[in-house]
A protein has these predicted regions:
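Early extracytoplasmic/lumenal segment of secretory-pathway proteins
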Residues: 29-94
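Extracytoplasmic ligand-binding site segments that recognize negatively charged/polar headgroups
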Residues: 37, 41-44, 80-223
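Short beta-strand->loop
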Residues: 102-111, 127, 156, 242-254, ...
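Periplasmic-binding protein-like
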Residues: 133, 197-202, 208-209, 240-264, ...
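A bilobed periplasmic-binding-protein/Venus flytrap-type ligand-binding module shared by bacterial periplasmic
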Residues: 138-143, 183, 257-268, 287-288
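Mature extracytoplasmic/periplasmic domains
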Residues: 263-321
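Conserved C-terminal helix/tail region of periplasmic/extracytoplasmic solute-binding proteins
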Residues: 320-346
Length: 346
């Protein structure tokens, strides 16, 4: 038996012992069903800490934000989940607009940064910010040197012909990260020029992944030269020693407010509220760094990991969460991307 197989089997045994569901599944039984949209390690660590603190048994499903939004919508007549934790804020806002979530005022609101509370206010109390992350990209410095690429600093640098079939990004239909990219480019450049950029970028794309964080791993392994993700996803692999340069694009960039939502029709609502309140505490928000996740936490008393991107050095656009978090605008932009970009020949 290989070491990799042994480790995998051991991990599965630990999951079973902890009462967690395997990735992408949810157990039928349980005192709480959590839909999770951060990396698997962070999801597991949160569940284990909550179970230890409360004694409440948790069944967890991990999927990308676009997938979970679609799942919650599909299950709305017979909800299976109780709380949706993590993932880009736009799909959470869309769920709120469509009446898929519940109003809730947590006693922890007073401890949160204004941007987290604004998310709650904008959603009419149906979702709240739990962390923030800056959009950007990363590139494998060894591969860049082999291709004799200049230092990459801007969005425009990803259009270099030397990067043909060497850039990876998620599909915005399934990934909140990639939808944030689409909305960012449209706001930064204007819609016509923004879609022109996406068409030119398409020529260099080798794969549209399902998960927004997947390109970071691909860059770390040398499977692609560059990947567009949230910057903290790249930092995770930089900390592990991967030859990655993280880029905050010179033209400016968008950002996410990772959010949390109580699902309308939750079968375990009181336990879901306990998770919601606990997930906003400094104690819970410190778990991200322990799981090698480097987002900026929403609780003012929680310390941002020292490895987290320095927001003071990043040029941010004035991201319009109200407009681009609406269901109508999301559907319109995705339909346009599908029609004008996704199936273009390379």
């Amino acid at each position: 038996m290989t070491t990799r197989t042994t480790v995998k089997l051991a991990a599965l045994a630990l999951l079973a012992a902890a009462g967690l569901a395997a990735p992408g599944t949810a157990q039928a039984q349980g005192d709480l069903v959590v839909y999770c949209t951060v990396q698997e390690e962070w999801c597991r660590a949160m569940v284990q800490a909550f179970e230890k603190k409360t004694g409440i048994k948790v069944a967890m499903t991990r999927k990308s934000s676009g997938e979970l939004y679609a799942q919650i919508k599909a299950e709305s007549a017979n909800p299976k989940g109780d709380v949706w934790w993590g993932g880009t804020g736009d799909p959470h806002l869309q769920a709120a607009e469509e009446g898929l979530s519940l109003e809730y005022k947590s006693p922890m609101l007073g401890e949160l940064h204004p941007w987290a509370v604004k998310q709650w206010e904008q959603s009419k109390q149906r979702t709240v910010g739990v962390y923030a992350g800056a959009l950007g990209y990363g590139y494998n410095t060894k591969q860049a040197a082999e291709k004799k690429l200049p230092e990459l600093k801007c969005w425009s640098d990803l259009l270099n012909p030397k990067l043909k079939d060497e850039v990876q990004v998620a599909d915005p239909n399934s990934s909140g990260t990639s939808y944030t990219l689409l909305a960012t480019v449209v706001q930064l450049m204007g819609e016509d020029k923004g879609f022109d950029y996406m068409k030119k970028l398409h020529k260099n794309i080798n794969q549209y992944t399902k998960s927004g964080a997947a390109p970071a791993k691909a860059v770390s392994l040398g499977e692609t030269t560059a990947g567009i993700t949230f910057q903290h996803d790249m930092v995770t692999f930089v900390v592990q020693g991967a030859p990655i340069q993280v880029v905050a694009p010179c033209e400016g960039t968008g950002y996410e407010i990772g959010s949390m939502t109580l699902i309308k029709g939750a079968r375990n609502l009181e336990n879901a509220k306990k998770w919601y309140d606990w997930a906003l505490t400094p104690e819970a928000q410190s778990i991200g760094a322990e799981a090698k996740a480097y987002q900026v936490p929403s609780n003012k008393n929680a310390k941002a990991p020292k490895e987290a991107p320095d927001f003071s050095k990043i040029k941010f656009i004035d991201y319009d969460f109200a407009k681009y978090g609406s269901s109508a605008e999301r559907k319109r932009l995705l339909a346009k991307w599908d029609a004008e970009v996704k199936n273009l020949p390379k």
